[in-house]
Amino acid sequence: CFAVLLLEVQGQGMSAKVVALLGILVAMNAVLRFVESAVPGPGGFSPIFLLIVLGGYVYGARFGFLLGALTIFVSSILTGGMGPWLPYQMFTAGWTGMAAPLCRPLVRALRAEGKAGEAAVLALYGGLWGFLFGAVMNIWFWPFVSGPAGQYWEPGVAFFEGLRRYAVFYVVTSLAWDAMRMAGNVVFILAMGVPALRILRR
């Protein structure tokens, strides 16, 4: 997976400046995640999504995906957090950055470029991904655990029944945890979004 990401960086004609910036942002986020693992915040509260969201928003979907995926990979080396969950973390963090440019039309419609409204739109986006990140992450282990009937996957379960069971499982096991991630994303983007965007656009 890491080799594919490196080939993507080399094969897409990224300028040396953009590749260097990608490396710097990945390193910054990896250090933030290392600190986060040493001094954990409440629930899923994490500072790393600030740069993933803003980087993808400013530099595009490919840059955002690489920033998210490489952040998770490099930080997992620092924290020793490698396991079967790692590909899910990498792809989901990558998707968080990759989809960030979808906020651009709304920002333009609101004429909020460079203003607090731009950060507000991105904060709402980051908040949504606070929940989506956890919802995708749970899939790596949900089919392999067992518990109360009506919450877990079983062979032969119909598609919509599986969705219903997963929704119940998510609410019971993860909603409160992911709400902390959502809150962290919103707080960091609202507090630092405008100056951070200004720096990234230089």
Task: Provide a role label for each language-model segment.
Residues 1-54:
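Hydrophobic transmembrane alpha-helices
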Residues 2, 24, 28-31, 70, ...:
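Lipid-exposed faces of alpha-helical membrane segments in multi-pass integral membrane proteins
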Residues 6-8, 48-64, 99-103:
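Generic transmembrane alpha-helix motif of multi-pass integral membrane proteins
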Residues 15-22, 60-64, 196:
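Membrane-interfacial loop-to-transmembrane alpha-helix junctions, especially the N-terminal start
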Residues 31-47, 70-104:
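Interfacial aromatic-anchored transmembrane helix boundaries in multi-pass membrane proteins
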Residues 38-47, 82-87, 104-202:
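Membrane-embedded alpha-helical hairpins and interfacial helices in multi-pass inner-membrane proteins
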Residues 64-68, 122-123:
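Alpha-helical transmembrane segments and their helix-entry boundary regions
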